[in-house]
């Protein structure tokens, strides 16, 4: 059975851009599982699988629905133990969780500042309007920081 991965896309459905979805795609590929990307625009996320999660990635594996890239990796590890491991054992789970948390606290804020406007510009117009309404306060700070560095 093919596992469905709901994958965040912008105006071009062939170019998924979420690093969290990429982590899941890489996990599925590493496990050698049969999977298919379901291109999902920003405004369609709330409707994925009947509103199962506010965010993606989400996978559907038969009757199972799992959200969050780390939870998905744990699910894949537990459900497909005969496939290559993602963590290399219990110690690897803790190490992976540490790296995830560290990157969320130290790298993600910077990457968000650097990439947010580029991501916004690559969204479909309807998605841009919704994203702008929800992130205008953040976008204005990013615009100010960007223009200050480009003088």
PLM feature spans:
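A conserved mid-domain beta-alpha-beta active-site/ligand-binding segment of alpha/beta enzyme cores
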Residues: 125-151
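GST-like domain detector, emphasizing the conserved glutathione-binding G-site
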Residues: 1-129
């Amino acid at each position: 059975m093919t596992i469905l991965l709901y994958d965040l896309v912008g105006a071009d459905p062939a170019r998924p851009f979420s690093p969290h979805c990429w982590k899941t795609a890489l996990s599925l590929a590493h496990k050698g599982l049969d999977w298919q990307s379901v291109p999902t625009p920003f405004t369609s996320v709330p409707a994925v699988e009947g509103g199962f999660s506010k965010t993606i990635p989400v996978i559907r594996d038969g009757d199972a629905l799992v959200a969050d890239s780390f939870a998905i990796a744990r699910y894949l590890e537990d459900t497909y133990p005969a496939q290559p491991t993602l963590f290399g054992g219990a110690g690897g789970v803790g190490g992976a969780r540490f790296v995830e948390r560290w990157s969320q606290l130290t790298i993600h804020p910077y990457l968000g500042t650097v990439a947010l406007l580029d991501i916004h510009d690559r969204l479909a117009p309807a998605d841009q309007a919704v994203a702008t309404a929800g992130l205008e306060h953040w976008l204005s700070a990013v615009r100010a920081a960007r223009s200050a560095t480009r003088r």
